[in-house]
Amino acid sequence: VFVTHDHADHIKAVGHLGEKMNIPVYTTARIHEGINRSYCMTEKLSTSVRYLEKQVPMMLEDFRIESFEVPHDGTDNVGYCIEIDGKVFSFLTDLGEITPTAADYISKANYLILEANYDEEMLKMGPYPQYLKERIMSRTGHMSNSATAEFLAENITEHLRYIWLCHLSKDNNHP
């Protein structure tokens, strides 16, 4: 299991998977601290956790895996770049904007999993309180459909084969 950040919707089961099922949980030291502080963690991580350093590749059998920083309002948020047999997968969810570092990892991808969280009009007109709308639209919130589309339109590479959009809001999107 590779953890991107310490928000409840991403970590609820990692304690059980790691400690009870003996599945290694890979994360940064700071994300691990955030996980163990979280109210939603009934099973804290201890023996199953494996630490990653951002932008330092690790090998897991034939997989070369590298984490990298992405802007979001959790603790020490990361995306992942995974390479096997010359094919590169970049995974970025829960990010408020695409930084130069994130763009670099996207440019390496043959297969890209990228957030397109919300439609701006649906979010603005929807039932969320204003503070939550502002959080979502912030530079450490989430990517809008249009921001994701604009980035992709300007940055498609010849070697990019597939794109999957992820973290689509059920309340503020119409995929």
Could you say what each language-model-derived stretch is?
Residues V1-T28:
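Active-site metal-binding motif and surrounding structural segment of the metallo-beta-lactamase
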